């Protein structure tokens, strides 16, 4: 699993109510990235991307642009040890 990386991100801006989670899921499935995405009650979106370094980097670049109608103001990210997640999913808001 050493060829995998995991990045935990928090995205701030106009990222809720604009299809950000659904677009993130579609992009992750296309890129072959595992993990999850969810809305936070404070208005941010939280996500975990796990996969090859190139695929995770592609997801991070996509997050900077976001979905149509979104306005990304800032992204906080933290590297974490990969957990071997099996798929990508949209999780409930917390």
Swiss-Prot record:
GO MF, any single term: acylphosphatase activity
The chemistry this enzyme catalyses reads: an acyl phosphate + H2O = a carboxylate + phosphate + H(+)
Q: What class of enzyme is it?
A: hydrolase
Going by the UniProt record, its keywords in alphabetical order are:
Hydrolase
What are the cysteine partners in each disulfide bond?
Answer: none
On the tree of life, the source organism's domain of life is Bacteria
Q: Give the E.C. number(s).
A: 3.6.1.7
Task: Give the family from UniProt.
Answer: Belongs to the acylphosphatase family.
Protein name as it appears in the record: Acylphosphatase
Question: Which species?
Answer: Synechococcus sp. (strain JA-2-3B'a(2-13)) (Cyanobacteria bacterium Yellowstone B-Prime)
């Amino acid at each position: 699993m050493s060829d995998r990386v995991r990045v935990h991100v928090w995205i701030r801006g106009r990222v809720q109510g604009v299809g950000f989670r659904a677009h993130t899921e579609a992009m992750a499935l296309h890129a072959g990235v595992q993990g999850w995405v969810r809305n936070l009650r404070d208005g941010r979106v939280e996500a975990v991307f796990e996969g090859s370094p190139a695929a995770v980097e592609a997801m991070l670049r996509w997050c900077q642009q976001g979905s149509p109608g979104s306005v990304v103001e800032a992204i906080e990210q933290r590297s974490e040890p990969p957990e071997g997640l099996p798929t990508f999913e949209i999780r409930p808001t917390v």
